[in-house]
Amino acid sequence: MATLYTRTFNFKDSLSDKEVLDEWKFLMEEVAPAVEKVEGVRSIKLYSGAGALRADITVLIEMDDAAGYERLLLDAEVRKLLGRVYTAWDLKTAGQSFRREITPELIRALSSSG
């Protein structure tokens, strides 16, 4: 079933404005295309809240199923990029969640009506 992986974060306060801009370019030009190539990934979108592109950032990755997350972590291209990604993030404020799509099949599977 379709799964939505959500990652929230702020960039580190120690980054200059130029470094933040460079990280956005890196995310958009290198990370997002690499993620989109992983089998089972439907899309990746990046959003910013009221944090002036420095904070309240959300990455949404829609996948065919929850196993897509493991495929992301095991993908050689994505793994090469993760070190830089995590270096720029304030991991103390970062969060993640998984959401499964509610479908009639899921409701039937979870209900006693079969």
Sequence positions of predicted segments:
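Short S/T/G/P-rich N-terminal loop/turn motif that feeds into the first structured element of a domain
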Residues: 1-56, 64-74, 92-114
